[in-house]
Amino acid sequence: SLTGSTSEQCLFILIGDGANGKSTFINVINKLLGDYSKAASSQTLVAKGSSSIGDDLVDLVSARLISVSETEAGEALAEAKIKQMTGGDVLKGRPLYGSWLEFSIIGKIFLATNSLPQINNTDHGIWRRIQAIPFNRTFTAEQQDKDLGIKLTAELSGILNWAIKGCL
C-alpha cells in the first residue's frame, strides 16, 4: 500500500470470526498511512442493481489503501467493478454535484469480514484477484489486550520501517 502500485491486481480479504485482530490490523495501517488511507462503504464492493461508477469511487482517487469493513453474509461481490478497480482501468465518474472526470484506483483494497462474500463467476479473472488472509485465532475476553491498538500506534515508526523493507 505504500507504493501506489496495483500491479498485483488483488482484493485482499481478511476473513475470520470476530475478536481476532482484523480491525486492529486495519486501524493501525490506516493510522500509518494517514491521508493516503480511505475507508469505503461495503456497498462499494457488493453487487447492486446498477454497476455504474458512483461518487463513492471518486472519493478513493488518491488513496493508497482502501479499507472496507464487513459485508453481509451471502452478499455477492460486484465482480466487474472489482476487476476494474484492481486492474488499473480508467474509470469515469463524478463527485456529488461535480463534473465528470477520468481516474484510476491506485490503492490496494482490504476487505475485513467475518464471512466470505459470494463470488458467482468461475472465471480466472476474478479468482486470481481474491487473496484471502485468514484470521483464524479468536481471542477470548480474558486474552484480549484492550490497549493493543494504542501500543501498536506508539510503534508506528518501527512498523513503517518494517513496511518499507517489505517494499524493497
List the model feature ranges, each with a label.
Residues S62-G88, L101, I119-I126:
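Conserved AAA+/SF3 P-loop NTPase catalytic/coupling segment centered on the Walker-B
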Residues G21, F25, D56, S67, ...:
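Helical mechanochemical/support elements of P-loop NTPase systems and associated helical scaffolds
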Residues E72-A73, N114-Q118, N136-A141:
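Conserved nucleotide-binding/hydrolysis micro-motifs of P-loop NTPases
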Residues F103-K108, T122-L168:
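Phosphate-sensing "switch" segment of ASCE/P-loop ATPases
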Residues S1-S62, Q131-P134, L160-I164, L168:
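P-loop NTPase catalytic core of nucleic-acid-dependent motor ATPases
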Residues I13-G16, S67-V68, F110-T113:
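Short beta-strand segments
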Residues A39-I53, A80-S99, E142-L148:
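Substrate-gripping "pore-loop 1 plus following alpha2 helix"
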